C-alpha cells in the first residue's frame, strides 16, 4: 500500500550544514478520510559504511571519534566506537566505502561486499546507508588513517568476540556498527 498525500507545502527552515525542511500535507487514511500532518525532514544525503574484519586474527577494525549529538544526548565523552562511514558526495556507495576505509583506517582493501541498505532514522532523516563488509590484511594498510580535515579519529582493532560482547554490555552504541557486527555473527563469517 502506498501512501496518498496531497497539498504538499515545503518550507525551508535551515540550510546551514545540510537542509532542513518543514512539510505540511494531507495524508489519505485507509478509511477514506484524510488528516493534515506536519513533519520536519532533515536531508544530509545518503551514506555508506564498511566493517573491516580479519578471519585469521579474529578481529575487526573500528574507529573512535567525537560525535556531538551523542554528547548532547548523555554520552559524557562524546566519543563513539563505530565502523567507518561517510556521505556519498559524488561517489557510488562502494567508492564511498572504500574512500572512508582509507581515510579513517588507512586500509586499502581488496574485495568489498555490499550486504544491505537501510534507512537509519526514517521518522525525520532522508538518509539511506549502504552497508559493506571487507576482509582486511595487515599488508593492506597504506596510511595511518585518522581521518581528514578537522577529524580526529582513533583506529581501534578489536577481537570480534569482544566487539560483539560490547553490544550486550552497552559499550557499543552505534546502530550501523551493531548491525554490521550482527551480520558477521548471523552469517558465521568469523567462524
UniProtKB/Swiss-Prot annotation:
UniProtKB keywords: Hydrolase, Magnesium, Metal-binding
Binding site for Mg(2+) 1: 85, 104
Binding site for Mg(2+) 2: 100, 104, 151
InterPro entries recorded: NDP_pyrophosphatase, NUDIX_hydrolase-like_dom_sf, NUDIX_hydrolase_dom
GO MF annotations in UniProt: hydrolase activity, acting on acid anhydrides, in phosphorus-containing anhydrides; metal ion binding
UniProt motif Nudix box: location: 86-106
Protein EC: 3.6.1.-
Domain Nudix hydrolase per the UniProt entry, residue ranges: 43-180
Pfam family, one: NUDIX
CDD domains in the cross-refs: NUDIX_GDPMK
Cofactor(s) needed for function: Mg(2+)
GO cellular component labels: cytosol
GO terms classed as biological process: nucleoside phosphate metabolic process; ribose phosphate metabolic process
Binding site for GDP-alpha-D-mannose: 38-40, 67, 85-87, 104, 127, 150-151, 176
EC class: hydrolase
Source organism, top-level taxon: Bacteria
Function (record text): Nucleoside diphosphate sugar hydrolase that hydrolyzes GDP-mannose as its preferred substrate, yielding GMP and mannose-1-phosphate.
Similarity-based family: Belongs to the Nudix hydrolase family. NudK subfamily.
Name of the featured protein: GDP-mannose pyrophosphatase
Lineage summary: Bacteria, Pseudomonadati, Pseudomonadota, Gammaproteobacteria, Enterobacterales
Gene: nudK
